[in-house]
């Protein structure tokens, strides 16, 4: 954890705190399975556990609520695995889930995490993982430049429009809006 914190940008407290706390839930999430006689450790959903541990810890340390929310959001979303095969819609879904305003911090957190694993300072061009993050960054910027709707408010239609078109009020309206946002 400390190495990841060391790898985070010095001028971004939110990313440094997220780097410090992003794996704090691993001990609780640790699971051991045996394959071919070898023990393998897994940490499924450790990011969710880490987020739940981080929130009260940061509150107890009297950090501002906005910073706590941001750090916990980064911790909760740090386990993304971008693949070049992602469609534009998949990139938009990632942005909807994480927020355009957070993507650079998430990339910084991933680079810090890589540094924590390998103890080698990472920049976007330094490794295959870094180059994938750079490609994701380029694709995110392209989606943002297209003025893609990344929030429900940014859609050209709203719930009232859907109800006027004959969709009954209720959960269906929300499902349709979310579907439109994801496509």
Where are these regions (language model features)?
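Short, motif-level signal for alpha-helix interfacial/capping segments enriched in acidic residues
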Residues: 1-2, 136
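Divalent metal-dependent catalytic cores for phosphoryl transfer on phosphate-bearing substrates
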Residues: 2-128
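Charged substrate- and nucleic-acid-binding regions of tRNA-handling and nucleotidyl-transfer enzymes
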Residues: 54-60, 117-183
């Amino acid at each position: 954890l400390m190495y990841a914190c060391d790898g985070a940008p010095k001028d971004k407290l939110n990313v440094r705190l997220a780097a410090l706390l992003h794996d704090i839930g691993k001990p609780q999430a640790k699971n051991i399975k045996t394959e071919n006689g070898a023990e393998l450790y897994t940490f499924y959903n450790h990011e969710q556990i880490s987020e739940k541990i981080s929130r009260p810890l940061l509150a107890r340390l009297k950090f501002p609520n906005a910073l706590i929310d941001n750090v916990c959001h980064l911790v909760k979303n740090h386990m993304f695995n971008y693949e070049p095969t992602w469609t534009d819609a998949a990139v938009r879904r990632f942005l909807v889930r994480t927020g355009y305003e957070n993507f650079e911090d998430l990339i910084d957190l991933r680079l810090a995490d890589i540094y924590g694993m390998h103890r080698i300072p990472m920049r976007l061009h330094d490794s295959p993982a870094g180059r994938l993050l750079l490609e994701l960054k380029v694709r995110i910027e392209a989606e943002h430049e297209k003025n893609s709707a990344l929030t429900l408010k940014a859609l050209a239609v709203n719930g009232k429009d859907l109800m006027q078109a004959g969709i009954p009020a209720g959960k269906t309206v929300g499902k349709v809006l979310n579907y439109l946002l994801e496509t």
